[in-house]
Amino acid sequence: MRVLIVCLGNICRSPMGEGALRARLDEARLSRRIEVDSAGTGDWHAGDPPDPRAIRCARGHGVDISGLRARQVRGADFEHFDWLLCADGSNLRDLQRLAPAPLRDKVALWLPWAGVEERDDIPDPYTGGMDDFERAWQLVDTAARQTVARLTRS
């Protein structure tokens, strides 16, 4: 199983999501069976590390994302990954436009896909403060935990 977590620039939500999901898969001893990566719909930050606030937030929860580097979604990702899970509706619409028609069903909003019912989107913390990063972390970590639960049922 291969999962790609997607946000806008791949420096805040999706690297935190990748880190959270990897950590939860490690806890469940599933990391050898499930590949996780992250990417952005835009290329502005390609090659950059995650935002320092995202690194600090994840580290505060025992997850190190400092070694990750931003990249843009590529056409090959639609073939390679089983699921491309988006942080928000804008990311979803962008990927649905890019995806070949037969592969569009691989693209989904991460929170509803994982069974997180309280909201659909993970708000982008980029223009906010640490409280916004913490709120985003809580959502990606909840999604990560519920993703592991979903994948262990299948």
Task: Please report, for each region that a protein language model flagged, where it lies by residue.
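Hydrophobic beta-strand core positions in alpha/beta domains
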Residues: 5, 85-86
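Phosphate-binding/catalytic loops
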Residues: 83, 89-154
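Helix N-cap/beta->alpha junction signal
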Residues: 14, 88-89
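Conserved active-site segments centered on acidic
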Residues: 1-80, 149-154
